From Swiss-Prot:
Belongs to the methyl esterase DnrP family. It comes from Streptomyces peucetius. The keyword Hydrolase applies. This is Rhodomycin D methylesterase DnrP. The keyword Oxidoreductase does not apply. Transmembrane segments: none annotated. Keywords: Antibiotic biosynthesis, Hydrolase. Its EC number is 3.1.1.-.
Length: 298
């Protein structure tokens, strides 16, 4: 599988291409503090088998990409969106199907607004619309209060995950088990959690990065202003919003709320899916994405 190191200003980004470069390009944008390896190989193989040349990459401050001193050189979502475009440039891709999860969901919306000519389609999941103040909703959840947005706040599982990540872990074994426990909580209660499956993935991700320590920098990045949500009405890219029905971070109807703000956007609900990508959801998730990309190219 070919890899490329791509430079965007002073940042170097690790990226990987899978499949036939002659096939329709599809860019995967991972969640916060996650590397390219957060997209499971088995899931990527389904996208490749459906006729896509899949590109995945490490966000800055993850995996094998550049580490930044955030205090001295802070960055935000505009820079992360520029990184995604730099990856496309690095693979000589003029326009691609884009799939973003969690933090990548936000980046995808910004790309649809600011660089629509680079998107063939957009699929977003495991996140909210730009007009939702997630930080305010999270604070409300911590206080046991209703959300500012009127949408469901993150669940207790998500709050438990945040608390768990603050607990000390020193050895590689402790760090690994904490990573697995994080995914158990994010997985939700719909799909039975396979600890061995996620342990294998986390060993792969840690080996890729060269450390069991998890990045935390993306937690410091301010969200885009909610005023940008009003701009979603001018999006012309075909958009699919996937609602994971057991997502503890962005419960239903967050995807429906997002789709209602974008002309022509569609919603697909995936039963039992949480804020994770266990093997059990790969088939319906890949099928939904590929049906969306095919429909846009007919």
């Amino acid at each position: 599988m070919p890899t490329r190191m791509i430079t965007n200003d002073e940042v170097t980004l690790w990226s990987e291409g899978l499949g036939d470069p002659a096939d329709a390009p599809l860019l995967l944008i991972a969640g916060g503090n996650l590397s390219a390896k957060s997209w499971p190989d088995e899931f990527v193989e389904r996208l490749v088998a459906a006729g896509h040349f899949v590109i995945r990459y490490d966000h800055r401050d993850t995996g094998r990409s550049s580490r930044c001193d955030f205090a001295l050189h802070p960055y935000g979502f505009d820079e992360l969106a520029a990184d995604a475009l730099a990856v496309l440039d690095g693979w000589q891709v003029r326009a691609a199907h884009v799939v973003g999860m969690s933090l990548g969901n936000t980046i995808g919306q910004l790309l649809a607004l600011d660089a629509p000519e680079r998107l063939l389609t957009l699929t977003v999941m495991l996140g909210g619309a730009l007009d939702v103040d997630f930080d305010a909703d999270l604070e409300a959840a911590l206080k046991g209060e209703p959300s500012v947005s009127g949408l469901p706040v993150p669940s207790q599982r998500f709050l438990d995950m945040m608390t768990m990540l603050q607990q000390p872990a020193e050895t590689d074994e402790e760090l690994l088990e904490r990573r697995v426990e994080k995914w158990r909580l994010l997985n939700g209660e719909g799909v039975p959690f396979d600890a061995d499956e996620f342990r294998r993935r986390e060993l792969l991700a840690a080996g890729h990065a060269g450390t069991f320590d998890e990045p935390i920098v993306h937690h410091m990045i301010p969200l885009p202003p909610v005023s940008r949500g009003a701009e979603l009405s001018r999006v012309t890219t075909p958009v699919l919003a996937i609602q994971a029905m057991c997502d503890p971070a962005a419960p239903p109807p967050h995807a429906r709320h997002l789709a209602n703000r974008i002309p022509g956007a569609r919603v697909v609900e995936i039963e039992n899916m949480g804020h994770a990508l266990p093997l059990a959801v790969h088939e319906p998730l890949a099928a939904a994405i590929c049906a969306h990309t095919r429909a846009a190219t007919v």
